[in-house]
């Protein structure tokens, strides 16, 4: 029944934590890292399941592997298939021809706004002491202050962007014009991390002269994505922007999966 594959099941997640006090058994991370050829993961959250520090119970499973195994690229195809209604509005069962929605969005998966949580989860998955970001002063703020640093590196950006260009080489181009195009989506008019991401994009793009480049700010991109999805071929962006944009894009294809 497993089609020749050897299957190992690892109980884990929030419900498992409530029952056992552990997010998963000791040695599970090492097994996934050293023994598994592929990992298929179900939902890990459970209502009311949190660690003493407030983190989601089960986070060291999905987030720990994401950071601990350096799974840096979240590759999300967005495609509307024949006969599948999109979810833009219930009354509009068909706005685009299916062939007009066919793009791939690449989200950087280890840095950015989630970096502290990812690194903390990876440390926990390895049985090490949890990570906390260094203290930062914020002049002018009053009362309790919570913060999440948003580190973005040239190394992390360039390898994600390079994968985007390589994927673009394997595709037929954007649906509207068959042009091979990689779009850089950021907020480089505001944040330094995004300015570095865009510079990294420009550096990588010089190695792919036969692929067109495109730029957009994330706020404007959200309206372009739903208004003219046929323009997009491959999109590269940072962690949280990609998290939000791909959930939005899922309505173009009728759902998350």
Feature map (PLM): residue ranges:
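Short, ordered loop/turn segments at secondary-structure junctions
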Residues: 12, 44, 80, 187-188, ...
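Glycine-rich phosphate-binding loop
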Residues: 31-48, 204-205, 210-257
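Glycine-rich phosphate/diphosphate-binding loop of Rossmann-like nucleotide-binding domains
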Residues: 1-2, 126-219
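N-terminal glycine-rich phosphate/adenylate-binding segment common to multiple enzyme folds
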Residues: 17-136, 146-147, 240-242
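Structural signal for hydrophobic packing residues in well-ordered secondary-structure cores
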Residues: 2-4, 33-36, 65-69, 73, ...
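Short glycine/threonine-rich loop-to-helix capping motif typified by GTGT followed
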Residues: 19-23, 190-201, 226-233, 250
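N-terminal beta-loop-helix "entrance" segment that forms/cooperates
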Residues: 2-27, 225
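Short coil/turn connectors at secondary-structure junctions
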Residues: 2-5, 34-38, 70-72, 93, ...
């Amino acid at each position: 029944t497993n089609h020749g594959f050897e299957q190992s099941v690892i109980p884990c997640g929030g419900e498992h934590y409530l029952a056992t006090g552990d997010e998963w058994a000791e040695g599970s991370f090492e097994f996934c890292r050293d023994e598994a050829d592929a990992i298929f993961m179900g939902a890990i959250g459970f209502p009311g399941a949190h660690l003493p520090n407030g983190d989601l119970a089960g986070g060291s499973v999905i987030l720990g592997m994401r950071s601990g195994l350096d799974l840096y690229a979240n590759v999300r195809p967005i495609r509307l298939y024949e006969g599948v209604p999109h979810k833009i509005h219930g009354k509009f069962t068909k706005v685009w021809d299916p062939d007009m929605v066919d793009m791939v969005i690449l989200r950087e998966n280890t840095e950015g706004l989630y970096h502290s949580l990812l690194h903390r989860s990876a440390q926990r998955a390895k049985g090490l002491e949890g990570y906390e970001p260094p203290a930062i002063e914020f002049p002018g703020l009053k009362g309790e202050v919570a913060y999440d640093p948003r580190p973005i590196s040239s190394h992390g950006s360039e390898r994600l962007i390079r994968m985007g260009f390589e994927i673009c080489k394997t595709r037929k181009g954007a649906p509207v014009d068959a042009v091979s195009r990689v779009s850089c989506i950021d907020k480089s008019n505001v944040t330094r991390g995004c300015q570095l991401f865009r510079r990294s994009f420009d550096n990588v793009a010089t190695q792919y002269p036969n692929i067109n480049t495109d730029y957009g700010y994330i706020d404007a991109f959200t309206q372009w994505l739903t208004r003219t999805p046929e323009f997009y071929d491959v999109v590269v962006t940072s962690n949280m922007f990609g998290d939000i944009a791909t959930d939005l894009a899922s309505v173009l294809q009728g759902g998350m999966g």
